[in-house]
């Protein structure tokens, strides 16, 4: 029996989402059409906007549907830069690659400094904001890093950002499956996330935007910020999961992560936690096995034991370059880090069995390495 421990890459469809898809396969209408078939599709879009808005404590008018998390990131950053003269982007180096790459392409941008766990050094952020007071600045951070699990102090960052009349965009794709998001309480100007991290369909994302935040469209063709015929089933599937997730938040905690880590400690020496132990997503376990190639660990666990995990962010798994996040925190063994991202609903015996198999693979690879260096 396999065990899927790669939920930070994507999640299986919720049963309720599957039911919604099956029941709406014939809802083929264009939501912009002015007839009853189009109206049915429009009803699904409106329903989903309300449910997503309720999930993050805002109004449906502030919800923009996109094609995914990367599209939301790009719309927020590029749209802000085009809408504001003398704009500058300050971004966290631990953010998703889509954020880093689009930020570098803006007229003026700068990477923020982080500590060894990946948390923003707020005093450095404040200095940069003070030095760049003449710019219209957008600060871009992730709430919870999907690779190393570190959670940022968004309340403090927001307070500092707005003290200098700057704007704050928060990428919540990695955190929203595990941590409730209240955009009003945190005083966030814009936030984005992806549907497929919440048990919904791929190809759908969300951008929350306060009504007074300046933004230019990413795709032109209508009066919308993200023009094109909307993905009705994808957006509808997100509406279903958004309605269910408040109950999930009540059940998700760090218990299963602690079980897996403690079981590894019983069986392995010379490994350590990557990221913050105190400020961490409850279902993220990124560990470093020095002397072992993380890609080999991932491949053997999958092929031999049907256990799925990751050697970092899924977006970087087919790249030969090292993880920008691990480089940003100055991880000394970046090619030996393995991410286990749990759902929070695994059974204890499944995790104990997984720990045995993980330890066996790591010990086997270390033994092989020793024999080949003699």
Give a label for each model feature.
Residues 1-374:
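Pyridoxal 5′-phosphate
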């Amino acid at each position: 029996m396999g065990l899927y421990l790669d939920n930070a890459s994507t999640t299986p469809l919720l049963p309720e989402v599957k039911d919604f898809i099956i029941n709406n396969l014939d809802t083929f209408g264009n939501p912009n059409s002015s007839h009853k078939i189009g109206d049915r599709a429009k009803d699904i879009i409106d329903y989903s906007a309300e449910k997503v808005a309720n999930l993050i404590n805002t109004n449906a008018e502030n919800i923009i549907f996109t094609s995914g998390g990367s599209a939301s990131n790009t719309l927020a950053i590029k749209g802000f830069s085009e809408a504001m003269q003398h704009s500058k982007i300050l971004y966290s180096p631990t953010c998703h690659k889509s954020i880093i790459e689009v930020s570098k392409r803006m007229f003026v941008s700068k990477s923020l400094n982080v500590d060894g766990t990946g948390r923003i050094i707020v005093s450095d952020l404040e200095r940069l904001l003070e030095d760049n007071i003449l710019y219209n600045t957008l600060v871009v951070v992730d709430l919870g890093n999907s690779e190393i699990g570190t959670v940022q102090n968004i309340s403090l960052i927001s307070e500092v950002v707005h003290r200098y009349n700057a704007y704050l965009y928060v990428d919540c794709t990695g955190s929203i499956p595990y941590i409730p998001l209240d955009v009003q309480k945190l005083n966030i100007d814009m936030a984005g996330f992806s549907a497929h991290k919440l048990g919904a369909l791929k190809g759908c994302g969300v951008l929350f935007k306060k009504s007074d935040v300046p933004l230019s469209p990413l795709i032109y063709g209508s009066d919308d910020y993200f023009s094109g015929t909307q993905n009705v089933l994808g957006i509808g599937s997100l509406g279903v999961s958004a309605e269910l997730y408040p109950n999930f938040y009540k059940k998700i905690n760090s218990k299963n992560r602690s079980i897996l880590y403690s079981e590894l400690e019983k069986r392995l020496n010379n490994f350590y936690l990557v990221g913050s132990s105190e400020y961490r997503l409850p279902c993220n376990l990124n560990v470093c096995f020095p002397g072992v190639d993380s890609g080999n660990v991932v491949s053997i666990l999958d092929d031999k034991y049907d256990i799925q995990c990751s050697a970092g962010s899924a977006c970087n798994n087919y790249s030969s370059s090292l993880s920008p996040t691990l480089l940003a925190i100055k991880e000394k063994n970046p090619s030996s880090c393995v991410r286990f991202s749990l759902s929070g609903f695994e059974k204890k015996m499944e995790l104990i069995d997984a720990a045995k198999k993980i330890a066996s693979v790591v010990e086997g690879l270390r033994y092989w390495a020793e024999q080949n260096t003699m």
